[in-house]
Amino acid sequence: MAKRSKAYEAAAAKIDAEKSYAPFEAVTLAKDTNPSKFDATIEVAFRLGVDPRKADQMVRGTVNLPHGTGKTARVLVFATGDKAEAAIAAGADFVGSDDLIEKIAGGWTDFDAAVATPDLMGKVGRLGKVLGPRNLMPNPKTGTVTPDVTKAVNDIKGGKIDFRVDKHSNLHFIIGKVSFDAVKLAENYAAALEEVLRLKPSASKGRYIQKATVATTFGPGISVDPNVTKVLTEA
């Protein structure tokens, strides 16, 4: 295991490893214990009580964070004709069809989200082995397979995030930057948590959210009490 930096060790010393913090308290502590000198990203991880190998226990969705992520997403749109022009006008970073499909088939994935018009999904679907593992495959359930490319691009640029449980039953997503006000971070966390709870599969038995953790990019993990869903602005 790599040796932790002194800054990391100092940050970890401020955290009670035996305690599960309220959301506001956790994000405040994450801000205070950021060991990096740059404006680090704050991420959340949930361990879910589901078996993602079973189709009826897959958790996948989207959430519009009320305060965005602090990151401007690079959006790729598979479209032609008027839809391509609309995507460009909406601010998409990459727009095309066969040219982009060929480039991605060669291994290029230098973008954060992908949108496709329904008529092109027959071709885009062949990119599953490249886009699927990176959670970049357009999907009707997340609003990224749609004729309304303008709305899709605006939503993603405005702070919409996609999430999907991985093979280890974990969900990961960004809730903002260290520079964000703690209340805004807590409100973003609450919005994401609410959507994850709404998507609980009926086949999931027992405790649904088994563990919740907040951490900065290179900072220590901070346990969050998943039973606290309201934004409490007092520790």
From Swiss-Prot:
Pfam families assigned to the protein according to its UniProt record, in alphabetical order: Ribosomal_L1
Gene Ontology biological process terms from the UniProt entry: regulation of translation; translation
Highest rank taxon of the organism: Bacteria
Molecular function via GO: rRNA binding; structural constituent of ribosome; tRNA binding
InterPro entries: Ribosom_uL1_bac-type (IPR005878), Ribosomal_uL1 (IPR002143), Ribosomal_uL1-like (IPR023674), Ribosomal_uL1/biogenesis (IPR028364), Ribosomal_uL1_3-a/b-sand (IPR016095), Ribosomal_uL1_CS (IPR023673)
Gene3D superfamilies (alphabetical): 3.30.190.20, 3.40.50.790
Family affiliation: Belongs to the universal ribosomal protein uL1 family.
Function summary: Binds directly to 23S rRNA. The L1 stalk is quite mobile in the ribosome, and is involved in E site tRNA release. Protein L1 is also a translational repressor protein, it controls the translation of the L11 operon by binding to its mRNA.
Subunit organization: Part of the 50S ribosomal subunit.
NCBIfam families in UniProt: rplA_bact
Name of this chain's protein: Large ribosomal subunit protein uL1
